[in-house]
Amino acid sequence: MLSQFTRSLSCFVKPTPPKLNKLTRTMTVLPKILQDARPKVSPELDYSTYSNYQNFKINHTDLNLNISFDDSIVNGFVTFNLNKIDKSCNEIRLDTSFLTVDSVEIDDAKVDFQLKDRLEPLGSQLIINPPTATSLNNEFNLKLGFSTTKDCTALQWLNGEQTSSGKPYVFSQLEAIHARALFPCFDTPSVKSTFNAAITSTLPVVFSGIEQSVVDNGNGTKTYNFKQSVPIPAYLIGIASGDLVSGEIGPRSKVYTEPFRLKDCEWEFSGDVEKFIQAAEKIIFPYEWGTYDILVNVNSYPYGGMESPNMTFATPTLIAYDKSNIDVIAHELAHSWSGNLVTNCSWNHFWLNEGWTVYLERRIVAAIHGEATRHFSALIGWNDLANSISAMKNPDRFSTLIQNLNDGTDPDEAFSSVPYEKGFNLLFHLETILGGPKEFDPFIKHYFTKFSKKSLDSYQFFDTLFEFFADKREILDAVDWETWLYKPGMPPKPKFITTLADNVYSLAEKWATEIKNGNTTEDDLKQAFTAADIKDFNSNQIVLFLDTLVQNKEIQWNNHHTAAKTLLKIYEDSIVKSRNAEVVFRTYRFEITAQLKESYPQLAEWLATVGRMKFVRPGYRLLNSVDRPLALATFEKLQNIYHPICKALVKQDLEA
């Protein structure tokens, strides 16, 4: 279980610091709080890898994979074309996790290797020793034969009974440290390479690259060939195979999914994706990846989306039948610049990926739907951040913006809304104090141009910020950097435009006032409220309405069962009958908060239909808070339908 995924420092192999490069030697003098926290080298070393990545440059990577649904394994070969950076280096160290390594070759000659004992959570270090140091050329090819195992955390396998088509399905999820469970690699966001992939399967395959050709092997399998011309880190690799069909949703975009979902997906995404791309290009610079496709995955997919280049992996909970959840696509698209082109060098600085991406996502949405929409989304995000921090087991550690995972803590354990929403709020604050978008937008272009195809730490970002706004040094010096970056808890709240929220807050306050005044019978409330109150609310406004009701500490809904039931009855069409997963989850949270016992088994049944951790983890926590036996029994029944990461984290939540 993940609560045990922490190793002693004595088990940790500290990376060897690289030689100081030009970027390291020319650092800006930052405010003292930042200067004191600055790592000795920039970018900071990644302590979540056992590889000696700093000794090599990966020029290119070739993947040759076979997918076996019968055995639930992926096997094959990976070949790295490498240059030595450290000329004295005489061994190669790679990351693996639950892999079988069959062979290792350097320039076509077999060499000895040693697979070290597994140390949780980072896996088993693979050490490759050439016969002599001189046999390791300055440029060489490293080829490894391998196979995944039944314990693989990188893949989820579904049999035909678990899919709508009756055919098996497999998909990968490699962020943060699970690429090492798919193939031996330098599993760190600090290094990138171009990729070619040849993947053989009995069913269609998608990959994080552009398809080049499909070869029919004449034995019931086909080999799908892909090319990724932009250098990417290993965690961005995405693979899925199953009964997949596709439809066009824009001039450079397709959606892939199971056949029964195709029409719904085409309707949900058509017309909007290209608008998002064009809006993003105006804010940053032209899209570099060629195509932008979307894979709508099976129900058990654990995240809202994963920014695999050229092929965004998305949750089916985005299909809301009203386009109200499509902002997630704006988020994953924004990753094409923040995260995929410009990447955090380690998971300590994850906010550089996600905070920037949320910021760009909301700028994209604002360009299409108006500035008030951006601020409204930020308000919902603020509530998500507050809920996330309040639910943390260890908020003192995991609610700071810059993390310290250098003791080998699993980055999955630190996953929360903090890097997303706290990161966004910092960038929004900087935009505001520096003069608004007109002043901040040139910096956006400069930052993403400067670090394109590179990895960096937070301090390199701050160097660039202070250099660019040298004429506004006093403004930047006045920022409370300690609170924003290093203190746990909520950040200072920016001033948001509340135009789209005012009616929501007003209605929620009216409900609170009626209840406080003792008007709690069904007749009383039906005289004060009607379905027309929210008929013009969009799904996001309904989400905020339900959030606000639950967060009002003056009203203990568990003491007002009749009022809670009446609210749901009055707004049944907009709330109870909603097919939007965001609304459905908030409805269950409201019902659980009110301790409406009839909702307990209904929530348990819903947890069998979703795999997205945004809903599954808090769903089990809610159920556990009111009916622990039901929560445990539900998880025991359903645990094997969830992704391995989701399963492990829910187990941890229930054991807390």
From Swiss-Prot:
Keywords: Cytoplasm, Hydrolase, Metal-binding, Metalloprotease, Nucleus, Protease, Zinc
Active-site residues per Swiss-Prot or TrEMBL entry: 332 (proton acceptor), 420 (proton donor)
Localization annotation: Cytoplasm; Nucleus
Molecular function (Gene Ontology), one example: zinc ion binding
Cofactor annotation: Zn(2+)
Residues that coordinate or bind substrate: 173-175, 302-307
Role of this protein: Aminopeptidase that preferentially cleaves di- and tripeptides. Also has low epoxide hydrolase activity (in vitro). Can hydrolyze the epoxide leukotriene LTA(4) but it forms preferentially 5,6-dihydroxy-7,9,11,14-eicosatetraenoic acid rather than the cytokine leukotriene B(4) as the product compared to the homologous mammalian enzyme (in vitro).
Family in the record: Belongs to the peptidase M1 family.
NCBIfam families for this protein: leuko_A4_hydro
PANTHER family: LEUKOTRIENE A-4 HYDROLASE
Protein name per its UniProtKB record: Leucine aminopeptidase 2
Species name: Vanderwaltozyma polyspora (strain ATCC 22028 / DSM 70294 / BCRC 21397 / CBS 2163 / NBRC 10782 / NRRL Y-8283 / UCD 57-17)
